Swiss-Prot record:
Family: Belongs to the LpxH family.
Cofactor: Mn(2+)
SUPFAM superfamilies assigned: Metallo-dependent phosphatases (SSF56300)
Catalysis: reaction(s): UDP-2-N,3-O-bis[(3R)-3-hydroxytetradecanoyl]-alpha-D-glucosamine + H2O = 2-N,3-O-bis[(3R)-3-hydroxytetradecanoyl]-alpha-D-glucosaminyl 1-phosphate + UMP + 2 H(+)
Protein name per its UniProtKB record: UDP-2,3-diacylglucosamine hydrolase
Keywords: Cell inner membrane, Cell membrane, Hydrolase, Lipid A biosynthesis, Lipid biosynthesis, Lipid metabolism, Manganese, Membrane, Metal-binding
Chief location category: membrane
Cofactor notes: Binds 2 Mn(2+) ions per subunit in a binuclear metal center.
Length: 238
């Protein structure tokens, strides 16, 4: 048996090729798999469970069907942090906390989306702290649907514009934040996404950090079993 991890699919109605690739993944890649973990940014944007787009409901049906075969877990990303219990139940996913620790084939492992590790990006971390406040979420979720969609569009545009001027190091995780979280959780291994820089990093302290790949140009999954750790590319259309 094996455990699969994916993240940063950024699904949207504008990219039916990614949606189809994920549907194919759910249909073909879950054999001999004990669990699937989705590490955030499943959707390009999520403005509330009450206004899910038709394609999102199609995906919910597919995930629900897959969840009858194995448990599917979800950690919020920076694009879909407003996914709630309503959509989770609709799709058969179990929502996990922002940082989740588990025993993975004898290795203590911590899972997270990864944006919290980019501590050099001070403006984003300030926004992240605000958006995670329970009262801020409550206010946002009670705004008219048109207002929420407008805010989401402006935030996406601002993010894309500001990211063009940020350095490589600011956009990546801060090594000290990685080591601090590993120490605080007493974990030997970390798995995250967000940076779109898939790799298996052996750290100086003997621990390991694994980054899952994004799905912009091809699919990507991390496959871990008792004896193997592998990042696997999934070309679209195959």
């Amino acid at each position: 048996m094996r455990t699969l991890f994916v993240g940063d699919l950024h699904l949207s109605a504008d990219r039916p090729d990614i949606t189809q690739a994920f549907l194919t993944f759910l249909e073909t890649q879950l054999t001999d798999t004990s669990a699937l973990y989705i590490l955030g940014d499943l959707f390009e944007v999520w403005v509330g469970d009450d206004i899910a787009e038709p394609f999102a409901n199609q995906l919910a049906d597919a995930i629900k069907l897959a969840s009858k075969k194995l448990p599917i877990y979800f950690i919020h990303g920076n694009r879909d942090f407003l996914i709630g219990e309503r959509f989770a139940q609709r799709s058969g996913m179990t929502l996990l906390p922002e940082v989740y620790k588990l025993d993975l084939y004898g290795t203590t492992t911590v899972l997270l989306h990864g944006d919290s590790l980019c501590t050099l990006d001070k403006p984003y971390q300030r926004f992240r702290k605000f958006r995670n406040l329970s009262w801020a979420k409550w206010i946002y979720n009670h705004l008219p649907k048109s207002k929420r969609l407008n805010i989401a569009a402006k935030l996406r545009s601002k993010s894309q514009s500001s990211n063009q001027h940020k350095s490589y190091s600011i956009m990546d995780v801060e090594p000290s934040a990685v080591l601090e979280l590993l120490d605080n959780t007493n974990a030997q291994q970390m798995i995250h996404g967000h940076t779109h820089r898939p790799a298996i990093h052996q750290l100086s302290n003997g621990k390991r950090r694994i980054v899952v790949g994004d799905w912009y140009e091809q699919g990507s999954m991390l496959c871990i079993s008792q004896d193997n750790v592998e990042l696997i590319e999934l070309p679209f259309g195959k």
